[in-house]
Amino acid sequence: MEAHQFIKAPGVTTAIEQAALAAANSALANAVVVRPFLSRLQTEILINLMQPWQLVFRPEVLWNHPIQRVIHNELEQYCRARAGRCLEEGAHPRSINDDPNVLHRCFLKPVGRDVQRWYTAPTRGPAANCRRSALRGLPPVDRTYCFDGFSGCTFAAETGVALYSLHDLWPADVAEAMARHGMTRLYAALHLPPEVLLPPGTYHTTSYLLIHDGDRAVITYEGDSSAGYNHDVSILRAWIRTTKVTGDHPLVIERVRAVGCHFVLLLTAAPEPSPMPYVPYPRSTEVYVRSIFGPGGSPSLFPSACSTKSTFHAVPVHIWDRLMLFGATLDDQAFCCSRLMTYLRGISYKVTVGALVANEGWNASEDALTAVITAAYLTICHQRYLRTQAISKGMKRLELEHAQKFITRLYSWLFEKSGRDYIPGRQLQFYAQCRRWLSAGFHLDPRVLVFDEAAPCRCRSFLRKAATKFCCFMRWLGQDCTCFLQPIEGRVGEQGYDNEAFEGSDIDPAEEATVSIAGSYIVTGSQLQPLYQALGIPSDLAARASRLTATVEVSDADGRLTCKTTMGNKTFSTVFTDGTQLEANGPEQYVLSFDPAKQTMAAGPHSLSYTLTSAGLEVHVVSAGLDCKVVFQSGVAAPSAAGEVTAFCSALYRFNRCVQRHSLIGGLWYHPEGLVGLFPPFSPGHSWESANPFCGESTLYTRTWSVSGFSSCFSPLEPCVPSMPPPAEVNTPVVLDALPSEIMEPAQPPASEPAAPPSDSVDNSFSPTSSGAPIAPPAPALPVTHLSGPRRRLLHTYPDGSKVYAGSLFESECTWLVNASNPGHRPGGGLCHAFYQRFPESFDPAEFIMSDGFAAYTLTPRPIIHAVAPDYRVEHNPKRLEAAYRETCSRRGTAAYPLLGVGIYRVPVGLSFDAWERNHRPGDELYLTEPAIAWFEANRPTLPALTITEDTARTANLALELDAATEVGRACVGCRVEPGVIHYQFTAGVPGSGKSRSVQQGDVDVIVVPTRELRNSWRRRGFAAYTPHTAVRVTRGRRVVIDEAPSLPPHLLLLHMQRASSVHLLGDPNQIPAIDFEHAGLVPAIRPELVPTKWWHLTYRCPADVCELIRGAYPKIQTASRVLRSLFWEEPPVGQNLVFTQAAKAANPGAITVHEAQGATFTETTIIATADARGLIQSSRAHAIVALTRHTEKCVVVDAPGLLREVGISDAIVNNFFLSGGQIGQHRPSVIRRGTIDNNVDTLDAFPPSCQFSAYHQLAEELGHRPAPIAAVLPPCPELEQGLLYMPQELTTSDSVLTFELTDIVHCRMAAPSQRRAVLSTLVGRYGRRTKLYEAAHTDVRGSLNHFIPELGPINVTTCELYELVEAMVEKGQDGSAVLELDLCSRDVSRITFFQKDCNKFTTGETIAHGKVGQGISAWSKTFCALFGPWFRAIEKEILAALAPNVFYGDAYEDTVLAAAVAGAPGCKVFENDFSEFDSTQNNFSLGLECIIMEECGMPQWMIRLYHLVRSAWILQAPKESLRGFWKKHSGEPGTLLWNTVWNMAVIAHCYEFRDLKVAAFKGDDSVVLCSDYRQSRDAAVLIAGCGLKLKVDFRPIGLYAGVVVAPGLGTLPDVVRFAGRLSEKNWGPGPERAEQLRLAVCDFLRKLTNVAQVCVDVVSQVYGVSPGLVHNLIGMLQTIADGKAHFTETIKPVLDLTSSIIYRVE
């Protein structure tokens, strides 16, 4: 038997497979890319809708309406490609900049959600103009857009595009609008669901949900986050049915694209539209089955779903077809309703067999199932009836036909057949079905619908003219317009619902009536307390504001609001207009957006709306997500006290200045009428109308001139120096020198300061002369008496040491005296006359040594500064007043000031005082005269205020009630805490600083202490001391000192502070606070935040080693104790036992808890840590601090569970330190003091912000870089040349990386991310390379190194280095638990951990195909870091001390010093050396050199041998890999920077000889030498070849070093190109914290460019060989980023995997 016919033909099969493969490739090449993240159901829906298109899913974004938007984007692409240059109706704001082919865009004025879309529109490009016009109601700036709508615009265009923007325009109206534009073709995308053809109801389909209420249809697709489209049903029906428009503007409508029920309609103007019938839904997947029992009438009292039930139900076609086929073919005996229900239930279940779907199923509701069963049964019954009737009637007809005679047949043939349409079966005489009959059918199948309707054009010229006349007549009668015959425009443009970003817009075309709010309103601060809380106003300032009332007079005209706010004796004016820039106290700018029609205004995070109601003006303020609704009544308020208003204004000003000092971004500058006003917190156009023309206070509460820095701030009052009271009587004997010189009458008014007219202002000085009044007779001479001491009186002390005195500045011992001079520096009146009497030589211009502005400096006969204040009689000039004080700060030493200008020049005291406060130097003194003293006493900086709110008082009283019910607290019966403000002093200090000893018996009446032990201690000293409960009876009206105040129960602390006449708190904020023993939650709820007024840092109790351990909590602690080491472990207990829990106290008789020991001092203590104290110690480090600071000589630690080690108190740190030879002592700290850059030239202001994209594209063009299609490279793994590699079983890699980037052009060498294969490549490529050993003596290399580092002598390692080690660990969030005892048998002691670096290196070369492996960090164990770290730090300090002044090491220098050294080397060139594989080429020779230097410094031999051992053979432990290797340098060991720099110095000094070496700088493997010439030494080749060094030397006029550009004779300049290039590689996500960190880094970099920006452009462009315009553009780009206006792109890029194989070799 032959079987060849059953054998497949290979050629045919291959050809078919090739054709299929080619088709698949073609489909993928032309596939639609789906970018949003989709659920599984959404994916299935989209695949079904988009057939036969091929889809490629690349999820990278989240969309609110993903299904519609994918379809929309595809149809949009089709329309725009066909339309070309066109007019667009209703463009989405976000698409404006993306479509340059659009000639003109028609919009409507934004309302509803359209406003939100315009706010989120791009702010650059063409969209910016449209956005500005839309939001501000401005006319278009050009012809590219309009806000007249498609129907009202007349822009001529041949082709148009309307993407989901015609759903509320009838086809006839569109035809007229196209004719008005002269348009011949219009591509329109519309959403036309078939359900609109059905009666009202709710329709569930497989793709969407449609709710049809009879008038409108709302469609929501699967997975939409909000309601979708909302359209007029009648208009949608017209678009479905209409295929042409007839009349004056004929039109043909053709469906050219369809995706589901989304259509692209091509509207073409045609003179004679022909019939174009079409089937709109040939691929419909639903059949609509009628429900006999439809929805009922109106809803009843209780809501019901009946009214929303469908009269039709969407049934999948496969369900309905199978059900009808099954029912129609059943036997008559088997046909029944139950059998149909059983079959329907069976086919409704989804069945899958593996990946094959055997039955799709149907998830239907009960109503739908009932309707389907009913309709199917009745339909099948009707069909069976038809079948029976047709057969019966047919048989009868056959019998009748066959019984006819010949004559009858001839008659039928002659007369019936001719001229008639013959349809077989008509002669059966069957009945005809009516449309409304049940027999007409129960379902609607959209697949068979055919439409071809014509809509007449609505051109009714005659009717329109008649309507216009009628409208004008009605207007003449004063009635509303009734133009009911106008065509309905509906929603056009951005108000279209069917664009995926346009859902839910509500349109109200009617203009709202503008309501005038003019009138007078009463504003009280108590109404605005919730707003103050939202704004973050301090409680004391809010309390002041709550006591104030204001009257606000409002007038509105010309689209602006003018408010006149009267508060006490002050009147403030504000003007609200759109676009006004508000004052801010930071770099952030705020522009007021004001809409008088909508009665809204907003700026930054604040928004406000107002409405005039019958009760008054209702204002709704929303700030930072918190809202406040207030109703201001009409009328005039009772005036507030002038003193309270002044105090409020002063406190508000200080708050604004405090925010300006300490906040990075600042906020609004709050004016008085901004907090107690009608529209808080806005106060645009602030001005203060004062009745006193010379008060000058109108500038006190604004920041327009407050741009200078701050040298100090207010601090609590310190004790004044005891002195005599100021003279109060005229006949009191006084010293003539002590008189305020400004009240002395001048002999004649000087030309520079003419005499001022008299004024009643209290701020005016007391010059008694007047230009317009006769000179008063001189007062009788006062008797002169010389007192034995100075008569100045201390009024206030600032934290920086500056002081304010009452008296004469001639008593000062400051270096400089400041004279209130005139512009010509001639002898004048007032204080200037007093200076001339004492120091006449100081007015000689020839003796002036320098000038700063108007200020003149002289040293003859003593240091004096002649400062010039502005003349406020001529002009108020606050900026000049600021400059007058600022010009006196160009000096060394301290200065004594008067209040400049408050005499003859009539400068207000408060204004001059504030200017001095902002512009002085630490240690300066200010001397006030009597009128100024009165002002200062009224406005003196107060003590810290503790505000007790009503909630706090209520909670404290509850705690007092609970206390009163106990035996201990019975004294608290009837005691209450009232809301209010308490002023206090708080002396805080380190443990044992003598806080208690500083209290004298004459200064206090009652001492309140937390424990009995402290009470007994105070009583032994003779004080009346009480515990908190018993002290309730004695503290009222007394001077009270509260010891250990933070540990007192807060309700008792508040009670005593409120009852006392004065309260002085003692304590330590870092020690144990009050404990909530009852666990009622009341203690933490009312615990006050106490602000120390003094800090004492010298301890007389704690030994030196204790101070080092607790320095993290007390950075400035110092000790007077002579005990060096007091902490010991594993010794017998001594002295007082201290435990942490009551259980441990019971187990150790005689012990006391740490809480009880707080404040006590013992000679010897034993700390016993038990396991039950773990939670207490871990949650409260204060307990450990208290336990460690109770002894003076010795403390034994018994820590069996290791609890103290977990919080950083480790014996291993101390033991290892002393084991390595450490000593108690103090070296100089290693911190380099770095100053701030002054704005000398400030050329950076000449560089405006620029576009980041243009800057980076220009950088790419000049460097030759291109956009990288990948995120990282996994380079080929090199061969393992030495060592042993342990690999994981799974080498999983990530295929892609998600980043937020500034640009897609990366200018850095793209390395591997942190994943398995990258780690293996780095381990093998960096640490598995063969080491070239070099056996030679180190004498020659050490001798060459002497050129930079001479021979070092023995050094000592002190506790200073130990403290710096502990401080570094604390800053990194580490504790002492990782430092172990030095046991080399333990792997944890010597484990070296490997991490893969994730940062890349800037390069001007290839960024992808570089073929280099990544970089890693091999971190030594914390035990070795703690062992070697102090020694290496001490060696580093010794090297720094031995370096020549022109040799710079690492970062241990001030940047300006290196810049000055480079600037002082003109004529030199720059020698640069770049090491390749610096760490990998280090070997036994470099290690030996390190050990020689360690021996020179006196390091113990066992430590040197241990270091040599660890460096020569090691194991790197990665997360899942490990490598055993030899000799390589580790980047994470404690001496990495030190020994890398030393080896770099040694190689450079040994291999090269320099002529005229001026400057040398070394940092790690980076080095630069400034010299006139160089040559390679004769011994260089031996060292380079022996060690396998890879040096790349460059010698050029300008070089690069450590992120700066080195320009001899000019200095060092920031490397702008390198910094900008590295920014391109950074990931600015995923959270805003990372972006803010990088933005601050950009700000720091720009600060370095402040004075050298222009020079940097010229020099940096030369060193990189780029154009100066590029550097200029990069600086502008950095300013854009610093302003927070950078744009980030979220990208998901693949990882290029080039790894091949890893070869093992064991040695």
From Swiss-Prot:
Cystine pairings recorded for this chain: C434-C481
Q: Region NTPase/helicase: what ranges?
A: 974-1218
Q: Give the binding site residues for Zn(2+).
A: H671, E673, H686
Residue span, Macro domain: 789-937
| Native source organism of the sequence | Hepatitis E virus genotype 4 (isolate Human/China/T1)
Where does the Alphavirus-like MT domain lie? 56-240
Q: How is its activity regulated?
A: Putative protease: Inhibited by chymostatin.
Pro residues bias (residue ranges):
747-757
Residue span of region X-domain:
799-956
Q: What is this protein called?
A: Non-structural polyprotein pORF1
- List the GO biological process terms: DNA-templated transcription; methylation; mRNA modification; proteolysis; RNA processing; viral protein processing; viral RNA genome replication
Q: Map out region (Putative protease) in residue numbers.
A: 442-509
Q: Which residues take part in binding ATP?
A: G989, V990, P991, G992, S993, G994, K995, S996
